[in-house]
Every structure is written in C-alpha cells, then in structure tokens.
Amino acid sequence: MRPVVTSSAPKASTPPPARPGGDGYGGEGSSGRSESTGSARLGTRGPRPGGGVVVKRMARGADDGYHSQLVPGLKSSLDAVRLINELVYAAERLKLLAADPPGLWGEVAGSGPLEERLWLAFLIALIGPSSGEDELDDPFSAIEAVRVPWGSTPDLDPVVPGPRAGFDPRRWSQTVAAYCGWASKAGSQEQGFKGEPAWTPERRFDRLYERLGSLPGMSRDARFELLSVLGTLGVFEIKVGRLHLAGENETTVAGKRVFGIGDTLLLDRRAMALAEICELPLVALDLGLHNWGTGVRVGGGVPIDLELDPDAIERCRRALKV
C-alpha cells in the first residue's frame, strides 16, 4: 500500500496508541507509513528558477496541550507519535544496512575494488535512490542507468533525482568534477576518506563533512548520507557525532520545529539528548526528522515498510510521554 499524505494535519485531539510497526494514526498495517485522508503529495523538492531548493513540510497537528521537554517545539501528541515512528524506522534502516544492505548499497559494502565502491557510493548519495513507494520499482534504477567506472564522467542530464538528491541538476558536472578533483588532490578516494591517521571516527565525519561541503552543489543531505552510510557499512571508521543542522533543508527545518529553536549548537545538543534518552543512534535522527517533516517516508534505497521494533517504540513513547 502506498502512503498517502495531505497538507492538512489530523483533526483528532487525542492520539490513538502507536502500535508496534503501526502508523501512529490507528490505521491498518505494520509498516509505520504515515497516512491521512487526502492525496496531495508533500515533501517533494524541485529546483527554483534561481537554482535554489524548495522545502515543503507537513502541516502541524492540532494543538492538544501536548508538551515534552525533549521536543519542546511539538504541541500535538499526534505529531509526537508520528515522530516516534519515523525515528524508529530510521533506526531499523540502519540495522538492515549494517546486516544485509540491499541493492547497490550491498555492492558498496562488498569486496570489489575500493575506488569503484567509493565512486558508486558518491553517485548514490548525489543522485539519490527513488522513494521506494512502489514495491515493484528498483530504487537504484536511475543510478544504475548512468553509472560509469571511476575515472569516467557520467551523463546526469536525463536523471530524475531522488527525493534526497544532493545536486542542482544544472550544476551536476561541476559537482562531479569537483569531487574527482578532491580525490585526485588527496591521492585517491580512499586517501581522501581516510584523512588524518589521528582522527577519531567522529572527527573523521566532521572533517570530511566540512571538506565535501566545499564542492559546488554538494548538499547537506548528500554529504550526510554518503559519510554516515560508509560508516554504517563498515567501509571506513566514520561515526556521526552531531547532526550538522544548518541551512535550508528538510532535516534542519524539521529539527527547528521539533526542538523549538534555531540555534545550531542547541539544535545539536537537543538532538543528542533525544537520541540518548530514546536509546536510538544519533544518525537515525537525520532521516527520521526528514521523513517527519515532509510527511512522506523515503528509505534511501531501503524498503519503507520495515517492521518497527516494538521495544524501541515503547521506549520512545515513555521518553516523550505520549
């Protein structure tokens, strides 16, 4: 079943209990997909005439007096339930990536030549897998159609970017050329990602996130996905130590709504506190906030109907008092 969302928040004032794997709205199924009554699709992004990014977001739930110090920006218990489901889904996605990565992510984690695997990981993060709503569709098909060996230049003109694509379609050639130049300067992609021997896994993430941010058109989402998945797959010792919530992107906008503040430092602190108390990996908040904010679940190459851990759901409900 495809998720259907609407720009209108649910009208109920009291949330139904979040069943393990349920959608938090009391609907059928075990996928954790968000549903409502309309059919208007939210959370899509497209290039503005000026080349910027349009950020659309789910309307707020009705204020029913809900309050939690962990998520002070939320005034609706329905919003809190929906957030729980998306955070737990994102955590389940990480488990699958670590244990049995699907599709092209499995190739990145495989035993082929490392330079080819890193190049493929870059293309996946840059182009972005499709949403995965249709179980018959291969979320990596657009990437597979344009992938070329390392050292060759792909033609991304015909590509329809995924929902978390990391490039401006009009500047993709600049982004690819800049990435290749970055790798060449380092000596190889491998050396570029390894960085300095003294780096801790968290330091490696932060420094690479900063360096890749100098590439034209390389968005926050693409950088975060590339580095976090390389760490999850065990390709390099890379670990997320903070969410880097800044700029105009769905994850940051959602974080500001959830945590009720715009200061970057405080956003990261509140995100870490939420992850710690809910016993979730901090990196799960990246995709979890994105999906909560847009109201449309995307899996980044992973099925969107993963069964949600009932114990994780219950921990989060206790933590958020909902």
Across the structure, where does each feature detected by a protein language model lie?
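Alpha-helical ds-nucleic-acid-binding substructure associated with the helix-hairpin-helix region
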Residues: 133-214
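Generic structural signal for hydrophobic core residues of well-folded globular domains
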Residues: 124-129, 212-215, 230-231, 255-259
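C-terminal accessory module of base-excision DNA glycosylases/AP lyases that mediates lesion recognition
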Residues: 32-106, 181-207, 221-322
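Phosphate-/polyanion-interacting regions in eukaryotic proteins
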Residues: 80-83, 89-159
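Low-acidity, Ser/Thr- and Arg-rich intrinsically disordered low-complexity segments
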Residues: 2, 6-8, 12-15, 36
